[in-house]
A protein has these predicted regions:
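Pan-zinc metallopeptidase signature
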Residues: 2-39, 169-196
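Stable alpha-helical elements in mature extracytoplasmic
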Residues: 61-68, 120, 124, 149-153, ...
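Short pre-active-site segment immediately N-terminal to the catalytic Zn-binding motif
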Residues: 108-125, 139-146
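Catalytic toxin/effector domains delivered as secreted proteins or via bacterial secretion systems
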Residues: 135, 139, 166-167
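Short extracytoplasmic/periplasmic juxtamembrane "stem" segments immediately C-terminal to an N-terminal membrane anchor
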Residues: 38-60
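Post-HExxH zinc-binding segment in Zn-dependent metallohydrolases
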Residues: 143-179
Length: 196
């Protein structure tokens, strides 16, 4: 009996160590996941769900967050819970979160990141739409739904002011607009359930 418990404890310990290593590796190599720990990172100053690397930028970040949140909710419904958003005003902060060339990035429904060039309402609304998509469809479905639906919806409903987007985003925005006109359901999430 003692030997049996010893084996169970060893297996449990191996599983725990494996999971701990997996979490550590994910945290190191997939930098955007760090948004989960935004409130605990010393380089950030958080007020509610808005985190900034420079405290002087907090008022502007809060204004952008609140405006984009309201606009997004008007277009795609209320959030299940208000997302955490990290606003980086320096390239160093953006690099900490693995932003690379992105202006902003939604990390599923875990949080959002905004790089220095992304401090514009349409970028933030675009990423909040992705956050809502992840809330409604799930994080895995964000990878399996058609790109024209995922990206087209975000570009179209965020009122991105650029008349022409790069390939393939321009086509995806146009395809979504056409689909949306043909499927005028007041509950956009109900309408998108049918799209595979």
């Amino acid at each position: 009996v003692k030997n049996q418990y010893s084996k169970i404890i060893k297996i449990g310990l191996y599983i725990f160590i494996t999971l701990a290593i997996l979490v550590l590796v994910t945290f190191i190599w997939f930098k955007p996941i760090r948004v989960i720990f935004a409130h605990h990172l010393s380089l950030l100053h958080c007020d509610g769900q808005v985190c900034v690397d420079d405290p002087k930028t907090q008022p502007l970040a809060k204004t952008l967050y609140n405006q984009a949140l309201k606009e997004t909710q008007n277009k795609v419904g209320a959030f299940h819970q208000q997302p955490t958003m990290v606003f980086c005003s320096t390239p160093q902060c953006a690099n900490t979160f693995g932003m690379e060339k992105a202006a902003a990035k939604a990390v599923g429904n875990l949080g959002l990141l905004v790089a220095p060039r992304g401090w514009k309402d349409f970028y933030i609304t675009h990423e909040l739409i992705h956050h809502r998509q992840a809330e409604e469809w799930g994080n895995i479905a964000m990878l399996t739904k058609p790109k024209w639906l995922v990206e087209g919806m975000a570009y179209s409903l965020s009122d991105d002011p650029r008349p022409t987007l790069s390939v393939p985003f321009q086509q995806w925005r146009a395809q979504f607009k056409l689909w949306h006109q043909q499927n005028p359901d007041s509950n956009i999430w109900h309408a998108t359930e049918k799209v595979k």
